[in-house]
Structure formats: structure tokens, C-alpha cells
Amino acid sequence: RAGVSAGLAYHHFGSKDGLVAAVVEDFYDRYARIANQTFRGETWAQREVRRVRAVVRFFLEEPFTRTLFGPLGRSSSVMQAESACMAMLIERGACNIAQGQMDGDLPRQADPHIAAAFVLGGLRQCTSMALNNPANPDVDQLAHAIWVLIAQSLGLREGSKS
């Protein structure tokens, strides 16, 4: 259908699964570049509000998100590629949450790795749910709704100037 040889995927990627994994890895590389930016703000919370908004914007504006978070996301090759990419994002997120704990914005009771996995999984699922809605989701509204849940689940302290 794309006007190329059926053997192209096998020649360059070894298999159809290899091609799919390469596309998924490219998506997650672009996601990681956005999520791992240094955001401006006086407090951890101010920076994270900006990070959540940027990630939500990426998910909503990236055409492949609907496909990846939909039926394709259940294939074993996608889940395998996604797992490796998410492990890197969780590691970076854990460092970020640990910094929020050291700054006194977050309580130290939560394990940073578990908290990062929870936040990233919730962000993905909330976006997936919003994309299944017939109306196009609004970036700001969805980002705000997700941020409220993140802040509450992590126990963001009231006096943290968020």
C-alpha cells in the first residue's frame, strides 16, 4: 500500500516486528526529549505543571499516539519495545520525584521509582481514555485534570508555592 517492496521491512529491520519496534522506539525517543527537558519554575511543582502540559500536548498532537495507545499497543513486539523505553523514563522520573522530596515539596514516604511508574502509567492511561472520547480533548483541560491527580497522589505539600 505504501508503494514499496514487501521485503523492505525485512531487509532493514529483520522482520515486521523489528519495523514496529523501531517506530515505537522513535515515538518514545521524541516523548523522552519532551519529558526530560529542563522546565522553568521556582518550585518543583511549577516545573512539573509545565512538564505535564508539554507531555499531554505531545501525546495529543502526535498522530501515532492513537495507534500506539490503541490496538497496536497490545501486540507483544510493541509491549516489549515500550517496556524498555518506559524503564528509562521511570528512572528519570524517579530522580525527579526524589528531588521534589529533597526540596521538601513531596513527602518522603513514597518510593520514587514506584511513584514515577504510577505517574507515567496514569498519564498514559488518562491520555488514552481522552483520545477515545469522540470530542478532541483540550490540552490545557486534560493537563490540569492529570496534574491535580498527580499532585494529590504524590502528596504535594500545600506550602510548596505550586
Task: Label every PLM stretch briefly.
Residues 22, 33-64, 112, 116-119, ...:
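Hydrophobic alpha-helical connector segments
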Residues 29-32, 57, 77-103, 113-117, ...:
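Amphipathic alpha-helical packing segments from all-alpha helical-bundle domains
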Residues 69-77:
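Short linear capping/connector segments at secondary-structure termini
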Residues 106-107:
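Conserved hydrophobic residue
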